[in-house]
Amino acid sequence: QTGGKYVLVFGTYFIYILLQTLFTTRSCTWADKPYYGIFEDLLLDFILIPIYVVSLKEWLTPRLLTRFLFLFCAGCLLLNIYVIFDLVGIGLFTDTSSAINFLYANRLGGNKLDFLGGNLYLEPQTLYIALTALIAYFLIFIYRNKGLKVFLGVMFLLLTLFLSFTVTKAGILAFILGFGIMNFYLFMRSSFRVRSAILVGIVLLVPVFGIFVFDGLKGKYEERTEEIVREVENVKQGIYAGGTIAPRVGFIRESFIHVDEFGVWGLGIYAKHRVNNWLQSSGDGLGVFTNVHNSFIHYWIQGGILGLAMIVFLFCAPFYRMFRTRRISWLICALLVVIFVMNNTCILLALNNSRLMILLLLGMFYFYNDVFWRLERGDR
């Protein structure tokens, strides 16, 4: 019954977009090209993924969840190791310093087009690295096998290193917030010995990064810091061209300029190309971009009030469920913060690289918060 109500939210939105399309195709005066791919996205991801998650009700146990989380981390680690070797090859061993500097300078390859038969964008890749780094850290305290603990510790360090290669402010900020939540929980629940180990580990982590990657990190991060300061000043002067904060402020500003077009009913199938036209004609240097870089605004433009309500529901439903059942999972809280922060700087819920996995995780957070809760209390 609960699963039916959850799926009904997305089914209602799908029907709304369908009716909206029938209405707008008859009465719309816009010359923009319609994009019908939203029906595929809604049906395959927003409806079928929650149905799949509900179907796991009889099988998902803390033990199976642990294996899923471990394999998720291992898969992300292997993918990024492949990416690194694809970028620098054996230079990682023959000239490690230059290879690391190259990875920082190129932000782990940036957006990788035609990669393994598809496209791998930097923001979704960063999201997965941040999520799996936190999960690997969490699993260190769940597994009892010392060998697995060491392996997970190495996995956590590597994933954290890979995250730093991306030089993605939102991803790093999201990771830091999630990491803080995880350590708050661990300090509350752990013994003095474990607390001491956590503190020692955190203290040692900074020097390790300083020794091995400081040169590359320093140069690229100084460049990004200067870029942020410069763009903040540009925004104050009404200049929105740039590659970090300025265009995102410009996207929000441009969206609210046209809020009368989408604020209530949304633009539906015309949203994609309509937004492109806004940016092209903005005069604020936004013409090189193609979207608003914010999932909440994206679905507000697409579905109006109902679209915005659907996205807010996605993030609020797991918290509502946890407080209602009084089974609060701190891992869920940490991962939700990561997903929320990054969706405010990129349309991750609209990209094929990330939409499916985000909806899968959000569905699991809602339906199986009790399984996460039991796992955190040692029930395996």
Summary of predicted features, one role per range:
Residues 51, 63-98, 117-188, 212:
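Alpha-helical transmembrane segments of multi-pass inner-membrane proteins
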Residues 186-237, 256-260:
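A membrane-periplasm/extracellular boundary helix in multi-pass inner-membrane enzymes
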Residues 9-15, 31-56, 67-77, 127-128:
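Aromatic-anchored transmembrane helix interface
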Residues 238-253, 257-303:
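Long extracytoplasmic/lumenal interhelical loops at the membrane interface
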Residues 134, 179-180, 314, 332-344, ...:
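Transmembrane alpha-helices of multi-pass inner-membrane enzymes
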Residues 74, 180-184, 282, 302-340:
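Hydrophobic transmembrane alpha-helices and their immediate junctions
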Residues 6-10, 148, 154-157, 290, ...:
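Loop-to-helix entry and N-terminal half of a specific, functionally important transmembrane alpha helix
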